[in-house]
A protein has these predicted regions:
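Structural preference for solvent-exposed beta-strand-turn elements
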Residues: 1-369
Length: 369
């Protein structure tokens, strides 16, 4: 095999597929990136058997062939080459020569046919959304997944396709995040649980342009994202996702309309008095036109008042400040509406059209104070 391409194209391609290289594996071939020049297109692939990424890069194929190269070494070499044309050539003994200007590297390769190719997916159905929308949906929900492997379903996000709407749900036992996106074409109802790791890595690759589309197709076991000459194939998480509909009540005793930035900044200031790992709640006292926020820790105490518009009853309630901050940070609206029932029931932050819903459980601030 012998190919030529620009350093910038190679760096971009390697950066994309490297996200599917496992940090630990018992199969050395999976620590490699496959360079496939057996057709008229140069393809780079990495695969950890749960997540696989393939991307095409432009360049010249002089001799067809393929080779697998250690991803870490290859990535570091490519990144530090001069900004010029790169030639990659494999010899009969699988030694791979990488040259750029006067720099020349000679490294060992592995047979390309030993590499774990991406599974060929018989696509059952597909949806299309813009890269901008998918990137935003991930940003606005991913913080609510659990990092505990003890409950695998909580480490993923539910993609619930129903009535021409994609509803994305994440939860960790303390909060639920929901984003709804209307779909342009009619597809059959389907529920898929996508690993959080997959979505985090996809979010890093997406350009985020509104005019660029992502095609999302799926089977019983896999989901495929196709965009910008890149294919991402991921295993789905098995099992039935949690039923949350009974938790999403529209009833409330107190409704608060408040400036999002003011509330976020106030809670952010309050957390200055909380050490990492210290579970001190922020206590919120809702009155007629004012919301008072208080926090007390070993470091000190703080209280602040914010103007609000309120409907319904006064309320005293406590929350983990981090959970409020996480939700408020990803809401783009200037004002937010918060719905509350009592000090023991979850609060809901949502817009009028319910394109986003954030459910956050309160904490017992008497016991925690």
């Amino acid at each position: 095999m012998k190919i030529k391409c620009s350093k910038s194209n190679l760096v971009k391609g390697v950066s994309i597929v490297s996200k599917a290289v496992p940090s630990k594996t018992t199969m050395p071939i999976l620590e490699c990136i496959l360079i496939d020049a057996t057709t008229d297109i140069i393809k780079l692939t990495a695969n950890d058997m749960e997540l696989g990424i393939q991307t095409e890069i432009s360049g010249d194929i002089i001799d067809r062939g393929m080779i697998a190269i250690d991803a870490k070494i290859f990535s570091e070499i490519v990144r530090k080459l001069p900004d010029n044309e790169v030639t990659i050539e494999t010899l009969d003994n699988l030694q791979t020569v990488i040259t750029c200007e006067k720099a020349k590297f000679d490294i060992a390769g592995k047979p390309g046919d030993e590499f774990a190719y991406l599974p060929i997916i018989e696509k059952e159905d597909s949806i299309e959304i813009s890269q901008f929308t998918l990137k935003e949906v991930i940003r606005q929900t991913i913080f609510s997944i659990s990092d505990s492997e003890s409950n695998k379903l909580m480490t993923g996000e539910l993609f619930d396709i129903s009535d021409n709407i994609l509803k994305v749900v994440s939860l960790d036992g303390h909060r639920i995040s929901i984003r709804k996106v209307p779909l342009k074409k009619s597809v059959a109802d389907r529920k898929l649980v996508v690993p959080g790791k997959t979505l985090i890595e996809i979010s890093k690759i997406l350009s985020g342009e509104a005019e660029n589309v992502v095609s999302i197709s799926y089977t019983k076991n896999h989901i495929v994202f196709e965009f910008d000459n890149t294919i991402v194939v991921s295993r789905l998480i098995e099992g039935e996702y949690f039923r949350i509909d009974q938790m999403l009540s529209n009833d409330y005793e107190t409704k608060v309309r408040i400036n999002k930035k003011e509330l976020l900044n106030c809670i952010d200031r309050a957390t200055l008095l909380v050490k990492e790992g210290d579970k001190k709640p922020i206590i919120i006292n809702i009155g007629d036109e004012l919301m008072e926020l208080k926090i007390k820790s070993q470091i000190g105490s703080m209280n602040e008042e914010i103007m609000i518009t309120k409907e319904g009853k006064d309320l005293l309630i406590g929350f983990n400040p981090k959970f409020l901050i996480d939700a408020l940070r990803v809401i783009d609206d200037e004002e937010v509406t918060i719905y509350l029932m009592n000090a023991k029931a979850p609060c809901f932050i949502k817009d009028d059209g319910e394109s986003y819903i954030y459910l956050i459980l309160p904490v017992n601030f008497n016991a925690a104070a």
